[in-house]
Amino acid sequence: MIDLGLTGKRAVVSGAGRIPGRAGHGTKVAVTLAEAGASVVCIDVDEGRARSTVELIERVGGTGYALAADMLDSSDVDRALGEAVSMLDGLDVCVDIIGNTRWDQTEDVTDDVWNRTLLFNLTQAFYLFRASSRHFIAQGTGGSIVALASVDGVSASPFHAAYGAAKAGVVHLIKTCADEWGRHGIRVNGVAPGAVGDGNDDQPDGVWAPDPVHPLARPRNQDIANAVLFFASDLAARVTGQTLLVDGGAQMKGTYIRADAQLDVMNDANAAMSVYYDRR
């Protein structure tokens, strides 16, 4: 039997709250790590959503803790990581799942949309990388950082200029931090999903290209969680600075969002996500 080396490990997952009607990457990642034997602190801006994920963890016999924090605020990120480390009595794995997007023709992207998109997808990732690295370095025992990137960060996608630029920044941040922190035994990797096949029922079907662009079909949230599990585990003990595409093969087929998508469909998708995107 293969030992993943996660039994008794201590993990933090940001963006782990369970949103009603959406499976969510964060929820799946937190539960999957717990199933592998890790104790998991679930961080979300809404403590109730974090507690919902902890309930799922407890149902599978795992150990979880809920923690509320605004991960878009650097001081609150530092505070939350400190509390999480106290809860767990240390830290071995830190996973960043926070992110958000909207679709806009590039010439229509406002300064506000650009700045918010970078804040949600790149700046907050930097905050969490920095905070977790300080704890890992102080411990002196190494650790694993895993971030959620995107296929849009490695290839072009229409109407995603801001999001693609932010996720490309995440991919580069992963490489830079992996290079700098390797001497401390800290591994830094990323998982880049494409269009996920479940957990996104409120996203209009018309935004996505037909299934034929996915040779292996669209990935599930569990597929994303499995990739995170690999990077967090001892199986990836000599893997760092990498971003793994989990997209059903879409990236090698080219863009998966139709360049001729109707703007009203795009606007419907933006409206569906605005409850999370527009809170600042």
Q: Where are the regions a protein language model picked out?
A:
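Canonical Rossmann dinucleotide-binding motif of NAD(H)/NADP(H)-dependent dehydrogenases/reductases
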Residues: 3-41
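Active-site loop immediately N-terminal to the catalytic Tyr-X3-Lys motif
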Residues: 23, 107, 155-161, 183, ...
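Substrate-binding pocket helix/loop in short-chain dehydrogenase/reductase
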Residues: 105-106, 110-118, 209-210
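Active-site helix of classical SDR
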Residues: 129, 166, 174
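Alpha-helical segment proximal to the catalytic Tyr-Lys
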Residues: 134, 179-183, 237
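Residue(s) in the substrate-gating loop at a strand-loop-helix junction
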Residues: 150
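C-terminal helical subdomain
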Residues: 190, 206-239, 244-248, 270-272, ...
